[in-house]
Swiss-Prot record:
It is found in: Endoplasmic reticulum membrane. The chain crosses the membrane at residues 21-41, 56-76, 95-115, 158-178. Induction: By endoplasmic reticulum stress. Pfam families: DER1. It comes from Zea mays (Maize). The keyword Protease does not apply. PANTHER family: DER1-LIKE PROTEIN, DERLIN. This is Derlin-1.1. Residues 219-243 are annotated as: Disordered. It comes from the Eukaryota. Expressed in roots, stalks, leaves, immature ears, embryo and endosperm. It is a multi-pass membrane protein.
Amino acid sequence: MSSPAEYYKSLPPISKAYGTLCFFTTVLVQLQILHPLFLYLDYPLVFKKFEIWRLLTSFFFLAPFSMKFGIRLLMIARYGVMLEKGAFDKRTADFLWMMIFGAISLLVLSIIPLFNSFFLGIPMVSMLLYVWSRENPNAQINIYGLVQLRSFYLPWAMLLLDVIFGSSLMPGLLGIMVGHLYYFFAVLHPLATGKSYLKTPKWVHKIVARFRIGMQANSPVRPPANGNSGSGVFRGRSYRLNQ
C-alpha cells in the first residue's frame, strides 16, 4: 500500500491542484484566517469595488468542515481523478480547458437571478461528476453501502441526497447543466456532425507546455527545451481507467 505522500504525488495535475486549493481554503476558513465574506461571488463588489479575486475564490470554498465538505472533496479525489486519468489521459490541456469552460459558464449563469450562487465549488464538482458519469455510464456505484446503481444516474442520486439532507438543489443542478453543456459541444455534437465548436484554444496548450503541467498528446505547442522534462508544477503520472 502506498503512503499518503506517494498517493498525493501520483495524482494527475489539474485535479490535484483544484482539490488542494479547495482543502486549504477550507482549512484557512476553519482557522479563521480567511472569512467566507472575502471569498463569495458578488458581482457588485467585483465591478464596483474591483474585488476581482472573487471570480476565482468562489470556486475554492466547498463548505465548512463537515460531511458535506468531505463528500465533495472525495468526489474530486475519486471522480475528478478518474476522469483526468481515464477519458482525459494524456490530454491535460483538454482537461484544463474543460475546467475553464465550466468556470466561465458558471460565472455567466450566476448573473441570472434564478441561478445566482455565492459559492461555485459545489457546481464545479457536480460538473466533474456529470462528465465522468457520461464517459463511464455503465460502471456500478454503491452509495453508502445501501443502494447500487449505474454511474449514469450518480449525479442525479447526489442531487436527491442534497435535498434529503436539507441542502439547496440549485448548486448541484447548475453543475449538471454546465456539465451537459460541455459534454454536448465537446463530444455529442462532434460525433453527430463532425464539427467541433469547443476545441481547446492554443493559449491553453501554451500554459500546459510552459509550466510542464501533465501531458498533452498531439499538442500544437512544444514545451520549453531547457530543464528536465519530468519536472513541473502539480505534475502527476497518467493512468488509463481500464487498466
